[in-house]
Amino acid sequence: TLAQRIATGFHRNTQINTEGGVDKEQFRVDSIFDRIATTGEVMFGLTLGCAQCHDHKFDPISQVEYYRLFAFFNNADEPRLEAPTAEVLARRAEHGARVKQLETELSALAKEDAKRKPLEASLAKLKKARPSAATTLVMAKRGKPRTTRRFVQGDFTRPAEEMQPGTPSVLHRLAQPDGNRLDFARWVADRNNP
């Protein structure tokens, strides 16, 4: 549903830096690190950030388990989602009907008809005036999966072994670990989650 897609925006609440010179891959990886830290603190009461670079010294989380969590978020894209209200949808329907009407009128005119040029200009102007809707940041399944690797000392330029999605052993087990963010969300919301 639209509400479920909008809810994925919780994980888009990371630092955003679009300044020139930003390494896009480093920014993407840093955003995932931030998502994992937020998920751990908010949903599990655990600080997971230390395990980004090494096995956690206080919480029973290994670096391998950290990157297994990383794998859940690594295969997501970060699009904007349009969320039109009922009013905007109604205005768009009216707008679409008017566009269709002008297109029909245009198709009935001969190529040399003097009325054609002003009608084409009106149609172009009308198409640009399509009612807009609010947008929100969401997460979506990536079309082409990325390979997830553990990073030596948390450095994305030093990839190590390949990692499969999974959850920390200190928490209850994920029944079907197939790398799906929806399965992860269901696991987080499970009654067995502390």
Predicted regions and their residues:
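Short, functional "switch" segments adjacent to catalytic/cofactor/reactive centers
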Residues: 2-13, 80-194
